[in-house]
Amino acid sequence: MSATLRFDNIGKVFPGVRALDGVSFDVNVGQVHGLMGENGAGKSTLLKILGGEYQPDSGRVMIDGNEVRFTSAASSIAAGIAVIHQELQYVPDLTVAENLLLGQLPNSLGWVNKREAKRFVRERLEAMGVALDPNAKLRKLSIAQRQMVEICKALLRNARVIALDEPTSSLSHRETEVLFKLVRDLRADNRAMIYISHRMDEIYELCDACTIFRDGRKIASHPTLEGVSRDTIVSEMVGREISDIYNYSARPLGEVRFAAKAIEGHALAQPASFEVRRGEIVGFFGLVGAGRSELMHLVYGADRKKGGELTLDGKPIKVRSAGEAIRHGIVLCPEDRKEEGIVAMASVSENINISCRRHYLRAGMFLDRKKEAETADRFIKLLKIKTPSRRQKIRFLSGGNQQKAILSRWLAEPDLKVVILDEPTRGIDVGAKHEIYNVIYQLAERGCAIVMISSELPEVLGVSDRIVVMRQGRISGELARQDATEQSVLSLALPQSSTALPGTDAGTETAAQQAA
């Protein structure tokens, strides 16, 4: 089998950080090559070199035995390379069709033929088995749908080499199955593919070979995954053994700290009520579109409620905006870090301290920069945030380190009472997940009421004290930790026509397959 793509001793240095250090491996024709490593290990940097966004400081990229050097995304695309990044790149106010054909819209005498563009896109989407409306604006689509647009864009270019960075991080199971079929079809068509994922199941199901990164270096390359254990890969990734990633231990729970009663909103099929005690972690599980995020946006004041009541420490409160929620000590860590969580052009220190700067004012006017720096340095060390300094722009950090900085923001807030976490470990490696779970436990031990939305069922089962399940815009049930199993949770999450699961392996498999 010939190597279509070869990375030969690739090195890349940023100020204060060696992102890649002598990385070499081959990606063969007709092969899906998995790439694994902790956040900040250098995987995405390598893909940015392949995509022409960065140039290597040393080493060579070779295609079909010839050295290539991409100085722009356009030169990479022209060479038959398609790179789909974890942080999506699209024009929100253009339609699906316009985004898919950006730069190659059919035209006549300088006029874009929109009818022909929509027809072409509709035919190609149907052929790929992707259910997207070519006329829909990207801004109106869910994150999962936007991710499918990015994937389809690469496939429409008929690329020879396709690199996917966490492509399923926001996809439902059905969308993931569509993607897997596309990848298998491309492999059969002799394309060469790189597949980055933190989901071990996907690597074993889809990949023919796998390379492991750690701290910018290639630690191992496995030409086949047969006989390679998951423990081996985890140990190669993190440099240590993680016996229990969740590290859960029971803690005493206090009185009800936060309660939502009969919350109504446009995305909910019926009023929703729940409560969370001091020190309690309540996991919210459901399929994509079940209404979990929508409910929390109503509670947080990000979306307008049609009705309902909120109480905090037994007293009624009004929350009509995110600012009002924060003043009550209620915070939301959003699913979409890039759009809603980080201030991309600000430093790591500024992002950590953004919510608690009012505590650093001297004489009510002057910011105590020393205290701000001390707080940032403390949490960078505590959460092992990989950054050359607190002054580094947060946009240059990996997704996992950005997430840790966002969590630090709330750990630094002394008046915190309620924390809502929406997919807190999406796109994050196993080592960073372990650290983030410890942060969640620290918040709970402080007496915070924690709500954790997650589409990863093992995570919900492993971290939560209690699990609330949503289905089709309503709360379908709740389970205590000791009563919760994969099957009992899924039976509450699936549409009612599919809930007759108990006792059959086939039923359990069907349930698992439909879970996000």
UniProtKB/Swiss-Prot annotation:
Q: Which domain of life is it from?
A: Bacteria
Query: What's the protein's topology in the membrane?
Result: Peripheral membrane protein
What keyword terms does UniProt attach to this protein?
Answer: ATP-binding, Cell inner membrane, Cell membrane, Membrane, Nucleotide-binding, Repeat, Sugar transport, Translocase, Transport
Instruction: Identify the enzyme class.
Output: translocase
Q: Where does ATP bind?
A: G37, E38, N39, G40, A41, G42, K43, S44
Query: What EC number(s) is this enzyme filed under?
Result: 7.5.2.12
Q: Per the UniProt record, which residue ranges are transmembrane? A: none
Q: Name one GO molecular function term.
A: ATP binding
Q: Which SUPFAM superfamilies match?
A: P-loop containing nucleoside triphosphate hydrolases
Q: Which Pfam families match?
A: ABC_tran (PF00005)
Reactions performed catalytically: L-arabinose(out) + ATP + H2O = L-arabinose(in) + ADP + phosphate + H(+)
- Return the InterPro entries for the record: AAA+_ATPase, ABC_carbohydrate_import_ATPase, ABC_transporter-like_ATP-bd, ABC_transporter-like_CS, P-loop_NTPase
Chain ranges of the ABC transporter domain:
5-240, 240-497
What is the annotated role of this protein in its UniProt record?
Answer: Part of the ABC transporter complex AraFGH involved in arabinose import. Responsible for energy coupling to the transport system.
Q: Describe the family membership recorded for this protein in Swiss-Prot or TrEMBL.
A: Belongs to the ABC transporter superfamily. Arabinose importer (TC 3.A.1.2.2) family.
Question: Would you tell me the protein name for this molecule?
Answer: Arabinose import ATP-binding protein AraG
According to its UniProt entry, this protein's organism is Paraburkholderia xenovorans (strain LB400)
